[in-house]
Amino acid sequence: MLKLSNENKKFIKVILDGFFRIYLAEFFSKFKPKKYKAFSKYSIVCPIYNVEKYLEDFFESIIKQRLDFKNNIFIICVDDGSTDNSAKIIKKYQKKYPKNITYLYKANGGLSSARNYGLKFVKTHWLCFTDPDDFLNRDYFYEVDKNIKRYNNEN
């Protein structure tokens, strides 16, 4: 029988651990909840000011919602005079999702000013305010929608 050194044992353990993590992740990915048909539609008003380092993750957390992003969620990004690459990143996502993302620019006036300006462009019954450094749980809008539907039917 072949005797392995401690270094070889560690190497084999790393390889096997990596293999099983990948295998298990693939196996369990089949059990993710299905997309959910919404009861209502939602707008997000998001004030933007020099937050380029958060924007990619922010958009991805909304696009990957269990509630279908393309049909149910609208993001109104109000650029409050950013001097970094925030506008460029927003426009990249806006180009990919033109029906879901609106980009507005205004001179710097603060978070409240940007939110109030964004309110003028909301066309849905339901609204939430998020900041670009907020990353939403995958089920956020699903849970909101489910509860609105449940309590709306009670009245």
Task: List the predicted regions and their residue ranges.
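Conserved donor NDP-sugar-binding/catalytic core segment of glycosyltransferases
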Residues: D139-N155
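A conserved acidic beta->alpha catalytic loop
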Residues: S61, V78-K88, D131
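Short beta-strand/loop segment that forms part of the nucleotide-sugar
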Residues: C46, N71-G81, T102-A107, P132
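Acidic helix N-cap motif at the loop->helix transition within catalytic regions
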Residues: Y54-E56, D84-Y93, F135, D139
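Cell-envelope/extracellular polymer assembly enzymes that use nucleotide-activated donors
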Residues: S40-V45, S61, F74
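Short aromatic/hydrophobic "clamp" motif used to bind/position activated sugar donors
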Residues: L127
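Glycine-rich, basic loop-to-helix element that forms the pyrophosphate-binding segment
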Residues: K106-V122
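Short, well-formed alpha-helical segments that are part of the catalytic scaffolds
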Residues: V51-Q65
